[in-house]
Amino acid sequence: MKLSRLALLSVFALASAPSWAESVVTVYSIDGLHDGDNSWYQVQFDAFTKATGITVRYVEGGGGVVVERLAKERTNPQADVLVTAPPFIQRAAAEKLLANFNTDAASAIPDANNLYSPLVKNYLSFIYNSKLLKTAPASWQDLLDGKFKNKLQYSTPGQAADGTAVMLQAFHSFGSKDAGFAYLGKLQANNVGPSASTGKLTALVNKGEIYVANGDLQMNLAQMERNPNVKIFWPANDKGERSALAIPYVIGLVQGAPQSENGKKLINFLLSKEAQTRVSELSWGMPVRSDVTPSDEHYKAATAALEGVQSWQPNWDDVAVSLSADISRWHKVTESE
């Protein structure tokens, strides 16, 4: 999920759509599912427009950025649907930016509730340049090696969902916040500096400008076709254990949405069996429905990549409560205030 500047993309009705296709639905989304031609979003938006006559207007930004935009528009909402990632979806719920809505697929989706639902499974990952490094860094300690000075970069916690995930993963891998922050303080000696975008780091790794960066599994798998020098890895802790934070795409209905009914229709459409079955084929993601198991090669590759890696997730509500304080502490320990 790279963090790009907000960009407005209008996905217009197909030529074959009915003449009554004047209604719209506006989506504020973290990116990653609209990358490249024939993406999952593009295919589903086109199919939705054809089926309903409703045009999809798409606004893209970082996980925290799209929520901040919703907050600024609280008195005059412009969006109908929000797609972001934890802990930003929990922040949106806590700030009462989301409306109550139980989706048609709720019973088939673990962790769905009356305010938001997982949309696509995803996981924190790391990438390295396999042309310049014979093997991936085996452990977190390896990343402190001097050879990575100014050759390592991760996106900024608080701005990018993936960057926030790096901070949380450090807490988990080192056993506590204190130990995680201590490590990130040391790692800063090798870090190139802040990056508002996770996705742009992939090209830098591919070109060898940096050797290592953070990312997420869905995005990195999709990008590897265009970036042949990039490979995925997960560093091990001092016990030799590799783990990956689960950071799903999550969808919710915006409180006070101008086209609330259209928003509900789109959410149900994206969570349908038909749409979920194609998310790996088109965008390398994994479906969230318990009754959908794709058989395409992308799905097989994604599941194979996670072999030997333990997935985990924190109590996201607790993370959302302490996020501002944790981000402030991150800036302090990395001297990036």
Swiss-Prot record:
It comes from the Bacteria. Keywords: Periplasm, Signal, Transport. It holds the Pfam family SBP_bac_1. GO terms for molecular function: thiamine binding; thiamine pyrophosphate binding. Belongs to the bacterial solute-binding protein 1 family. Probably part of the PhnSTUV complex (TC 3.A.1.11.5) involved in 2-aminoethylphosphonate import. This is Putative 2-aminoethylphosphonate-binding periplasmic protein. The gene is phnS.
